[in-house]
Amino acid sequence: MISSPIFRFLLPAQNPLGFGAVDFIALGLAVLLVSVLPARAQILSAAQKLAGRTAVCMALLAALPIVLRLALLAHHPVPTPRVADDFSYLLLGDTLAHFRLANPMHPLHRFFEAVFVIQTPAYSSIYPLGQGLVLAFGQLVFRQPWAGVALSVGALCALCYWMLRAWVAPPWALLGGLLAAIEFGPLSSWMNTYWGGAVSGIAGCLVFGALPRLRNTRRTRDAILLGIGLGLQLLTRPFEFVILVVIAILFFAPLRSLTIAALVLLPAFALTLLQNKQVTGSWTTLPYQLSRYQYGIPTTFTFQPVPVPHLPLTVEQQIDYDAQVDVHGMGNYLTRLGGRVRFYRFFFLAPLYLALPAFLPTLRQYRFAWIVIALGLFWLGDAFYPYFYPHYMAAATCLFLLVSVISLDKLSHWSREAVTLILILCLAHFLFWYGVHLSGNQNLLIALSPEESWDSIDNYSAGYTDLSGRIAINNRLAAQAGKQLVFVRYWPQRTAREWIQNAADIDRSRVVWAIDLGPGENEILKRYYPDRRAWLLEPDARPPKLTPYPAR
């Protein structure tokens, strides 16, 4: 047992105290808890006073996850995009940063085919605009798309508190905001990828925060916020937008408020139609739908026929298509549903499961039963799609938090000590893993990473192991002078993921990534880019192999 890497870290290290990294983390947790517990009454009193100051709480909750993530930059730099979804969303953000909805078709687009990217009739991402707007904001204002991701997570945490204020007492709303910061903040995949999640979560906060306020006061401001939330969801996840509309109706939102919200929603509809026209040439065809027609991906619902590609597929596109065919259909439907249970862990820290039974007695009131109905509609809406990720249900994020907070509130009537213990365990869980990542201990991170929850920060973004080799390749290309052209040659037995990752303006990009189509075809692209140094990348090698392109 003592040979295990984890136990070896508990042995004396090279420091005066004989502490290893885990020792320092444990000591820090102990100091924190010993300091907090005796002062619990004073802390609760201060929190109650703070909880009613909406603007201050929202500002603090917005800043908290961002500051915590920035503190990790020394060991976990700005996330490296790794998968086709990342590349497609970054393309969308870059397109919007150029103040256009689509890019002209490239004359040699056959070299630039990639998963989740359309080449004809326009060069574009297949995704809706919402997440792209956030990335474009980060790129334009901070020269870094990830800044938009971080800001969106901060906004989500602040708006979770605002939403909860309409449902529970201010102290519980503040607690919910803090839970959001540690669940969806610095260590979350939503903060450390470019796929999104926070933007749809913001939309859900606006909708589910406005609805109870409209039933109580019917203020025009809340109707406008409802419309903004629905519009943001339409621009981010159009299918779940329909679910949100149904939920709003089931909540018996006043007709006048729904009318105002519908008017506020019109610009989002207009933007969607305009994007459709710019990308697909049709006002009513989504880029998503065109990709499904052209490449057969993304797939259809389980009860629909498997889409048939109408264009030749690249190796990576074929792999993705075959994978989607394998999971499509009703044959393994129940197995897939069972496999989705683990994804709901994303919305609950493990100790919170102990409090959830306290929520059950509240279901006798429609106001609380409606929460379960709303979550059930989200579940049902996504149940027939072969794949599932937490961002599919991101709009319901605040509802999961609401269930947690109400459960803790009800449990506190039975046992305050139980609630205190659950919250201490939640805090200790977060602080332990945050301390592990903050320590920057390479061996510790590698040893403990299998024990961390699947949805956590990407340990390899810091280059500790860089299993895909992307960071090393990117760094090598960045060190070269002038413009570069990289031909990507996949091996017959693929192990790598998508490597074609071009910007909106391909011809003006410093690095152009192209599919290796053979010596004859490649010469055409080399002549098109006479001022670029050509490279050959073999990403399936271990490590990926980058060599000067052979001269003819």
Which residues does each predicted region cover?
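Transmembrane-helix signature of polytopic, membrane-embedded enzymes
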Residues: 58-62, 160-184, 198-202, 216-225, ...
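Transmembrane alpha-helix segments characteristic
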Residues: 55-69, 180, 225-226, 230, ...
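Membrane-interface alpha helices of multi-pass inner-membrane proteins
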Residues: 136-137, 163, 176-181, 205, ...
